[in-house]
Amino acid sequence: MTKLLIQHGPQKGQKIETALNNNNAEGVIFSLRDERIDSIYDYINKCPKLTPKNSFIDSQFYYSTYDKDITKNLENSFHFPLEVTRRDMRTKSARMGEYFENYSEYLEGKFDNILVPGLSIDAIDWKFDYTLDIYKNFHQNKKFKNYYMTMVISSKMFHSRNDIDEILLDIDDDTNEFDNNGVYLIINYDDTSDTNYESIDPETLSNILYFVYMLKKKKFKIIVGYTFINSILFAMLDCDYIGSGWFNNLRKFTNSKFKSVDIFGRRKKKYFSIPLMSYINLETIRDLSNYYDINELKSNALCDESAFSNIDNVSFVDLEHQFWESLSLMINEINRLETIEEKIKLLKSKIS
């Protein structure tokens, strides 16, 4: 059974509480890059729907090997190590040990699950090896109900089935002694000039799904973070959790996050259409209304009428909740089915 988590980021306001109260999400993955841990923990304690079981802290240690200018609030978290090198990992430098101890010590007893710090992986090299080593160390020495290995993997690595099989073999060899294994998977997509940010080539997608499927067969619990509409496919594979946020960059992790760049642009109001299995600009819906039955595009969300009747009647926040609501409705339908064949049949019926 798959559950939807809110992928936390900047400008959270009341978005998380509202989504939880409306039963459109079942927990949160919190970002230490965007908010201090004490503030996050206070927020969890004040929010009735958040518990040690459904609240996850993403250490975002994968930023540690990049320029310190991109770390934002991470510098204030548990003596976060900046600009980590291979030598730091090889020699087990004091700053690494101090950080891991501070991070786990704070979470232990407060949270059921730990997202074990991991590095950003773009090849089968030292970053992958040390991600496995960190996970083993935490599993052997820390006390949590569930352990999730944080793996931020470049989408380029999913071009090769052989690379994926090698990664799976190494994971299996290094974790088969443990119970309660899990993976917190983030796909790091290349920056692209394609205006359709959901775009992904079929081979890459196929190998990502294969990777997740094989981990599930090995009894790993799976969280896939920063998902967009592809989260429906992960739900069909019975991933335990999928994470998705309120901005596009909280729904798709791209390589731009590891660069000091300013991104500007006019934000457009977009509606998540289940029948289209895509987003559509409200301006486009308005233009289509003259020669197409736009009711066929609706996802049966609470804001449908206001969104479709007048573009000015609906806010960006309304549409953020519309996305989670529609996604949650779809996931709930998938959860009620047993076989992948039934789930495929359901999906085809939604878009036919």
Task: Briefly describe each language-model feature range.
Residues G27-R36, N113-L119, I229-I232, M236-K259:
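Glycine-rich phosphate-binding active-site loops on the catalytic face of alpha/beta enzymes
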Residues I167-L209, M236-L237, R251-R267:
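Glycine/Thr-rich beta-alpha phosphate-binding loop at enzyme active sites
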Residues T254-L276, K343-S352:
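C-terminal helical cap(s) of enzyme catalytic domains, especially alpha/beta-barrels
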Residues N295-S352:
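C-terminal extensions of enzymes
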Residues P48-K49, K216, A235:
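Anion (oxyanion) recognition and catalysis
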Residues K216-S231:
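Glycine-rich adenosine-cofactor-binding loop
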Residues D262-S306:
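C-terminal amphipathic alpha-helical segment
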Residues T2-L169, N180-N181, Y189:
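Active-site beta->alpha loop and helix N-cap motifs at the rims of alpha/beta catalytic domains
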